[in-house]
Each structure stands twice: as C-alpha cells, then as structure tokens.
Amino acid sequence: QAKMVTVEDAHPRQPRCQYFGEELQMDACIHLWFGKTKTALHAAIDDATGQVVGLYFDKEETLNGYYNITHQILTKYGIPYLIKTDKRTVFEYKKKASSKVEEDTFTQYAYACKQLGIHIKTSSVPEFKPRVERLFQTLQQRLPQELRLAQISTIDEANKFLSTYIKRFNDKLALCINNNKSVFENQPSNEKINLILAILFKRVVDSGHSIKYNHHYY
C-alpha cells in the first residue's frame, strides 16, 4: 500500500537549470575528512552540469572559506548569475552586537556579490539546494579515503590536494561543460577580484589625515 506524504513533507524533485553558471549551490560540511580533527569543507557546485566549481578546507565554516571558493570560481569560470545557499551559513544576515562592519559576515559577502552583479538566495530547507547536499554525501564516501592514501594531515596539504582532485571528480561524475550554454560572464581581472574579495573595515580619518588600524596609524 502506497504511503501518503503530507503537503508539508512533500518536496518535488527540482529540474536542472539549463545553463552552466545559471545557478551555483554553496555550503560547508564539518566532518572528519582527514587526520584526527574535524574540519569544514566549503563547496560550490553548478546545478546544470553537476560540475564542482570550488572546494576549500578551513578549521570551521568561515567567510574566508567562501571567499576562497568564490575566488576559484571567478578566476576559472567567471561571474555566475545566482548563488543558492543555506540561511545558517555566513550568508545569513546576523548583525553582531559590536556593530563592527568587519564582523558582519553577510554584509561582507553580499557586498562583494553586489559589486560583481551576483544574485544570492537563501533558505533553511535542505531541498532548496539538493545538488550540494548530494555532493557532500558523495564526498564523505570518497574523499577521506583518498586523503588518507595521499597521507594528508594538514589543511594546507588538503587544499593543495583539492586543486587536482576537483578535475578528477568532475571527469568521472559530472556532465561535460557546453560552452555554448554558459551564462558565466567574463572573468574579472586578478586586481579587481582581490579588491572585491576583501574584508571591509570602517575607520575615521582624524585631524592629522590618518587612520588607526590594529593599534597603528597610517
């Protein structure tokens, strides 16, 4: 006998996007990927092709982790149209009590995306970004063993390993990229990328035309 699913629990399968770069899904997964300490793997995957477009390890889920995978995307593919992610990540707006703009992570990332013309959508529902959820399931089955065989023990070693692992993963499991169906805009210059993927600090110019940062005047 077929079991009826309630409307609240029903999540119809989402069709793939038509174009490469039309929608990227981002998230981070804390797991025992290598060694004896859990780390956060930040990931971005293209919805249309299943191509992994960015991977980066950090000690925890951080703005730095998302900036690094965004840097990989911009330098290799260009500017995507839309990024989908979870509300529980640094993409969610949570104003810190200190009111310091540099600690307001959503402001930092959203401003960077606004400068590039990238749209952001967030949701707390896992089915909102099924592609990246399934990616982490696959990576949890495959990646720890490969890192162990490569004798990886540090984050730096793991990130270096990922630079070659992404291509092997995509060649085996993703659809081929059809450049005629790409909506990625042209790659910005390295100088522009470095200026945009930065952490902003609000400072006041004093009467001596100087600013103070980390106890130093400039």
Regions found by a protein language model. Give the residues of each.
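Basic, flexible linker segments flanking DNA-binding modules
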Residues: Q1-M26, H31-L32, K95, K100, ...
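An active-site-proximal beta-strand-loop segment
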Residues: E22-V53, L63
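Short, charged, surface-exposed loops that flank catalytic or proteolytic processing sites
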Residues: D27, E146-L162
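Residue-level detection of beta-strand-connecting loop/turn positions
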Residues: G35-K36, K87, H215
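Active-site beta-loop-alpha junctions of metal-dependent nucleic acid enzymes
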Residues: L55-L82
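RNase H-like two-metal-ion nuclease catalytic core shared by retroviral integrases
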Residues: T85-K87, S98-R142, I155-A158
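C-terminal, beta-rich DNA-binding module of retroviral/retroelements integrases
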Residues: I166-Y218
